[in-house]
Amino acid sequence: MTEKKNNVSVLFLLFSVLFCVCLITANVLETKQISLGFINITGGLLVFPVSYIINDCGCEVWGDRKARLLIWLGFAMNFLFVAFGALADAIPGAPYWDNDEGFHAVFGLAPRIAAASFVAFLIGSFVNAYVMSRMKINSNGKNFSYRAILSTVFGEGADSIVFFPLALYGVVPTKELPIFIISQVVLKTVYEIIVLPVTIAVVKKTKKLEGEDAYDNDVDYSVWKILSVN
């Protein structure tokens, strides 16, 4: 019998699990509003940027193809979480259950918000991976810090530009939307910069353990190929 070689390493699997956990956790934390002096944010900001850091690590070590796999896996698990949460929220509670309001606040994500979140996540994540991948080729693998920060700016920028108009247009004053977008991009980029030493250490250690340092010279970045993980 011929033994089939696995295409995914244990370490990549661990990265994938952490990526999915971060996305799902961010969904739950989004229901809490946090005040930071002169600006208000959602609790999801605490953990969501971690998904972009993992995206950067995955793209840097394993390349754009594995980054696409990571993104689609995260999207699928996030969708299942939201779908089952919405289903449980729609089913009437037991007569003695008196916490429907609290449960709905966490799992009753409005369809518009959910749709905006899914679209923004896909676009932002693919932009982040694309910028990271192309810059690695153009720089011959140098300047990881610069590439990680710039890919986050573009990725988070695309995410916010898509999410806030889709989710909040007509709900908040139109003039407030640019403020939401800019503040989210700035805060998430600052987050990336703060944890950059950790990101660099993780990337170096992962490359050493995996014996991988992918360059995407033969990758097709067309829209149709983005839908593939091959």
Predicted features, each with a name:
Residues V153, G157, V185-P197:
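Hydrophobic transmembrane alpha-helical segments of multi-pass transport and channel proteins
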